[in-house]
Amino acid sequence: MKLEREHVVDEIIGDVKTNKFKIGEDSMGIIIDSLINLYSDPIGSIVREVTSNCYDAHREKDLKVAGTIPITDEDDPKWFHPTSKKPQIEFQEENVLLGVGNAFLFRDFGVGLSKKRVEEIYTLFGNSTKRDDNNQIGGFGIGAKSPFSYTDTFYIMSKHNGKTFSYMLYRGNDAFHMDLLTEGVTTELNSTEVIIPLDEKESYRDIKRFIKAINNQLMYFEDLQFINVEEGGGRKLKKATIDYEDQDLLIDLSQQHEYNVKEVHLIVGRVRYPLNHSMFEDGLWERDEIPCGIKFDVGELDLVPSR
């Protein structure tokens, strides 16, 4: 998502001593904590942000194959999956490899996560590869770290150009860390997995909360594959049935009848956002008339990071 930056001062005339604001090393953890805790709905934000990153990884791969954006020296198309391979969300009742119990796994088959990208992009708060165009959803540089708003530890497994990497991301006493656990070779094509262990004490409740977030956040996402989410989670997933759609509006009557969703809402790209009706004059519309989504392209609205 291309971010619009406001320029307040374009030029300083005269001999003026300028001091740039900095972040003290000892305060880095506090600042990062503040960024992570921006999200008003942590689980909903995790589902939205990590799934959007999965789609962005596929989009980046497809744009590079098409020649729309340049291939870098880290890219080797022979390791790319075909476009028919779609992002996945999986519920795992146990991950023996990592030694964790219930977990949600988000898997993409995009360009893969190289060691260089980990060092230069993934571990830097505010860094993003998505700010120069509106071809991808992200752009703030904090969405990949959104799992920290729910858990102190999560994992990433990456396959990139014939190599495998597994990482543990965790919150330390004074900073956040991403440690390389294992490195090996593989014949499998590129992919990235984000594994979020559930709180052991609240696992049953949080399974339901994650599935509710999937239903609320991702109902308009297309070509998304679910593995053991309904079966393992014990709750039905919503499937949008589009009754009407044009360039501005989308109507899905099944939301009203099956899920009691009646509000007018926003759709940015394919992400569903609630609309704050209190900001509008009374009587502007009957909010309980019909479940209608107002559509916007990525980059058309200025979204806040706390969304």
Where are the regions that the model predicts?
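Generic recognition of flexible, low-complexity loop/linker segments
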Residues: S34-L35, I142-A144, T182-E183, G283
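Short helix-loop "hinge" at the ATP-lid/N-box region of the Bergerat-fold HATPase_c
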Residues: V50, C54-H58
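Glycine-rich phosphate-binding loop
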Residues: D132-D152
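Amphipathic alpha-helical transducer elements in NTP-driven molecular machines
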Residues: G44, R48, G141-A144, F148, ...
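Interdomain "switch/hinge" adjacent to the Bergerat
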Residues: M1-E25, A57-I137, G162-R307
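Conserved aromatic-histidine-acidic binding/catalytic patches
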Residues: L35-P42, G110, N135, I142
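Glycine-rich ATP-binding loops of the HATPase_c
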Residues: T153-M157
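Conserved short strand/loop->alpha-helix "switch" segment adjacent to the catalytic nucleotide/phosphoryl-transfer site
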Residues: K22-E49
